[in-house]
Amino acid sequence: MKKDFKLNVNFPWGKYFKENKIIYKILLILVVFMVLLFNSTHIIAELQWFQEVGYTRTYLTRALAVAGLTLPIFLIFFTISILYYKSIAKKYDLVAYPKKTPKEIKTRNRFVYIAAGIFFLIVSYGLARDNWYIILQYFNSVDFMEVDPIFMKDISFYVFRLPFYQLLISMSLSVVVLLIVLTVFIYLGIAAKSSINRLNFRNLQGILHVIKSGFIQFAGKALAMLIALYMLLLALKYYMDAYLLMFNESGVVYGPGFTDVRVHMPFLRAMAVLAALSSLVVAYGILKRKVKFIAYPVVLIFALGLVRVFVGLGVEALVVNPNQLERERMYIANNITMTRQAFGIDNVDIRIFEANQDISPQEIRANQHVVDSIKVNSYRHTLDFIKQAQVIRGYYDFNDVDVDRYMIHGEKKQVFLSAREIDHKAITPATWQNIHLFYTHGYGVIMSDPSTVTSQGQPDFLMKDIPVTNTTDIPLDNPRIYFGEMVSDYVIVGTETEEFDHPKGGENETYRYTGDAGISLGFFNKLLYAIEEKEPKILISSLINEDSKIIRRRNVVARVKAIAPFLSYDEDPYLVIANGQVYWMIDAYTITNRYPNARTFGGINYIANSVKVTVDAYNGDV
């Protein structure tokens, strides 16, 4: 017979939880332990990796920046909240729970302190982790020595300092709003537990009575302080919003136009002044329980905001649009000048070359080296042919073709280059041992001459095959590729099993890694990376010994991004052969979308190719 489930409201829940308190404490300790374990293993693994690549200082700078920012943010948030809670909790207890014992109040306060501490620690860490670079930029900013055409401020103000001010204002507003909401909820709790106020919201008089006799009486001073602070922060926000018009995209130009400069900027400054003055008026109204002093400033700011919108629309329609080119001429010129300046094309030397179709045989003979280097092959078609002719085994692949120039037999020639990498997705069977211990690296480089073809009309290979057949005088002593564009998984070298090196006829040549890359796998590190990689085989496999090393972050772009995340990288590294080794070269850029008055392309409006990065394909050195 089916029975309906009913909750036993008479069950002694309090006694049950009290008797089983030790179980919940153990569960809480286990949860905290697991969280700390996984976070600490990640931190240690990251630190070891940065030590391996020689960039410990970079990691520590970031880690110390996050930790150094988390602490003050936490202390500010936590201290303000707890002090405010203490000031308001006394009234709450007197009215809502007059019979509560000091012990009960102490227990509740302890819970509030712990909960608030955990909450604000998580929030503070999140803010520090997501904004550490903004804060470091602010404290390490350098002037551009160039100014914007409207406010005449150095460009560094917009790139480095304005984001920091916005962050401070945003965080402060969030805390103040949180405290105001907390005050309202505490008051509603009191109103529900006592006769201080019956919450009559049926008419305007009832609402005014609730505000004047209940809410303000309960939290008048605290609320006055919070509202005043909120209005001051709002004033700062309006003041900073005027600078944000330098990034306005709604007009005919990127940045401020006629209406922005003549209407929106003055209105925003007026609203900032009004909000600052209103902070005092609203605070006075709360303390004196005069609702009109609270309402009028708020209504006035809102009304001024509406007037700004309608005046802006009117000026745009009646003043600008009928004579747009004349009105916007200066601002269009500003936009063009700042865009050229931002992208470094303001001093371009323009030269006109007249094309001459009448080329004589004498001119051809005089420029034979130019004619000989004319490309007859496309890199796309060359890649297709390489994949057909040079993959050799199904577990190899070529990601792309790069173009470079080399001195070959005393002559500078343009060449196509492509690296033969291991494709882990194509390995069969895809066992853990095959992917991480056996198939550890690619092998060889294909070099072709784009200006010639074979007698069959195919690309002319200068380097090809396994082992590498090299018809150039460019030495390639080590063709092994442990770091590349296609790889992403970790590998473990120096194990009890030999690594696959390359096929040789019907057999496989094996190899043991002799480079410097990798982190030694003693017992502690085996346990550490078993947790970090979520792979218990790292700990229990009998193939891993004390001489084994784990090599991580083998994708060259991911590798350099981890070292310097504040740069933007070209996603297409190009291959270089030098000193008998294979290297990857990556262009790195400093970018921003905060260059004032400059048009954006692809989400940015400033770029500089400030850094060239090389990665050793064998050792992973950066």
Annotate each predicted stretch with a short phrase.
Residues 3-20, 26-29, 33-622:
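Soluble extracytoplasmic regions of secretory-pathway and membrane proteins
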